[in-house]
Amino acid sequence: MLLSALSLLLSPLVSASSAADYYVRSLPGAPEGPFLKMHAGHIEVDPDTNGNLFFWHFQNRHIANRQRTVIWLNGGPGCSSMDGAFMEVGPYRLQDDHTLKYNEGRWDEFANLLFVDNPVGTGFSYANTNSYLHELDEMAAHFVIFLEKFFELFPEYANDDLYIAGESYAGQHIPYIAKAIQDRNKGITENGGTKWPLKGLLIGNGWISPADQYPSYFKFIEREGLAKPGTSLHHNINALNEVCLSKLETPGAKNKLDVGACELVLQQFLDLTTEDHQCYNMYDVRLKDEAKSCGMNWPPDLKNIEPYLQRPDVVKALNINPAKKSGWTECAGMVHMAFTAKNSIPSVHLLPGLIESGINVLLFSGDKDLICNHIGTETLIHNMDWKGGTGFETSPGVWAPRHDWSFEGEPAGIYQSARNLTYVLFYNSSHMVPFDNPRQSRDMLDRFMKVDIASIGGQPSDSRIDGEKLPQTAVGGQANSTAAEQNEKERLKQTEMHAYTKSGEAVLIIVIIGVIAWGFFIWRSRRTRRGYKGVSNNDMSDSTSVLSRFQNKHSGRDVEAGDFDEAELDQLHSPSIEREDYAVGEASDDDDHIISHPETGGNRQSS
């Protein structure tokens, strides 16, 4: 025990001090191909309590018109962001407990991707067990300290457009962190320094407004046909819902993050519908789970993540501080119990100010999630006031339309947007949208960040709003690696050679035209030497130089392309030069239609 305590006290002295110390040189089980550039390890945020946050950073595969960084957070509170890294938006998915494969919907395509186990004590992060956090503002303060030190280590990312994304209880974390960043930036403006360009927030199936979302449990259960009217189940759940609604009307209840009477609605539904030791999966009601778990064993990939992240070679590869002795767990029960947030107001109260300050916000929901269901998200939007309107009101009594979204020919969901807030509903999707719809969720991210891949190329995805094709976003190719750099050099060399060839062909055509024009001029000058009357009745034969004749011609008007007869130009066309050799581009049929863009504190600390 004494040695363990001593190692924790000494850990800041032996912690990494430069970016090179965080470099991930290899990753057990990684697929063949160019190795991704990544860094991982701990950053100290509170020396008094040995508070350290673990991060894992992936460099983007491509840069499209500007540098971007996306921070991803899972919820709980107390659930590791390695869930997001290995089951949702990271570059890899686990095939088994020792083999990785590429994720087809990876979010590091056009953005640097930063996963953080937050708050301290979560996942690979650690702190003294008697110093776990209790409030949202404490968590946000730690996170700003983390970012200060991260950007000191990696200053090349400090000016990236910054986005914060996550799901479930991260719906509380993200707005609080955004507000803390804004407060920090204001201080930087006054005292000098680099502001972090925070551009947007993305929250999936978020726990944001308990007062709006608790009543949605019964509404969702009814709408999905999980409790038929007239049955005892329906009667019992409705009675519990009435108690919840009554409790929410008591003074101060709407500013609480956890209302016990409302938690009972979900808990009793799961208990009363348990049959043959099987209950509904509260994260995907299309599925069942063993009794008492009710979704805690889901997704199926989960069984591979813990063994993989507890492997000694993986722990070493990720530069885990030896002072972290307990090993990785998905959700830390002690962190969850400590994080009561009794003195914190729900993050929904922060969203209007963030939006009005110019930050774009995107809320997205999978339609089969119960615990943070889409009805609750739609209700909180409907009741929220921001930028001079209520909900998706575009003018008094007029609401922004819902647009049908299709992806590669299949219905994907619905888009709705007004005044810097966008809502996306994903069809056939769970609490973890990117797990079910990896490529569609990446398409959503790219559009929200306004990614422009016009200069990159690649095979675009077919994404449409109300049948109208959206700008291209998807692209393939090598990652940022040695092989990628070599391929890029080769591509530039070929481009230069192609340009040189084209320029040579262009010069040849000009020379041919010049020779013919010169010969024609000589022939005409011999015939008209006796005195040709020009249009202005001037005798052109008196001109003594070729230059003066060109000057006389130029004094009229500029020569336009339309002055030439196409038939004459065709006569100059060399049969050895094909049209595609000197074509400079083709018309694009892309249109200009652009859509800009909890893991509750209840029974389970979810992903």
From Swiss-Prot:
GO terms for molecular function: serine-type carboxypeptidase activity. The chain crosses the membrane at residues 503-523. It is found in: Golgi apparatus, trans-Golgi network membrane. The active site is at S168, D369, H431. Coiled coil: none annotated. Pfam families: Peptidase_S10 (PF00450). Keywords: Apoptosis, Carboxypeptidase, Glycoprotein, Golgi apparatus, Hydrolase, Membrane, Protease, Signal, Transmembrane, Transmembrane helix. The keyword Ligase does not apply. Glycans are attached at N420, N428, N480. Residues 1-19 form the signal peptide. Residues 535-550 have a biased composition (Polar residues). Residues 20-502 are lumenal. Residues 524-607 are cytoplasmic. Residues 458-487, 532-607 are annotated as: Disordered. Its EC number is 3.4.16.6. Disulfide bonds: none annotated. Protease with a carboxypeptidase B-like function involved in the C-terminal processing of the lysine and arginine residues from protein precursors. Promotes cell fusion and is involved in the programmed cell death. PANTHER family: PHEROMONE-PROCESSING CARBOXYPEPTIDASE KEX1, SERINE PROTEASE FAMILY S10 SERINE CARBOXYPEPTIDASE. This is Pheromone-processing carboxypeptidase kex1. It comes from Penicillium rubens (strain ATCC 28089 / DSM 1075 / NRRL 1951 / Wisconsin 54-1255).
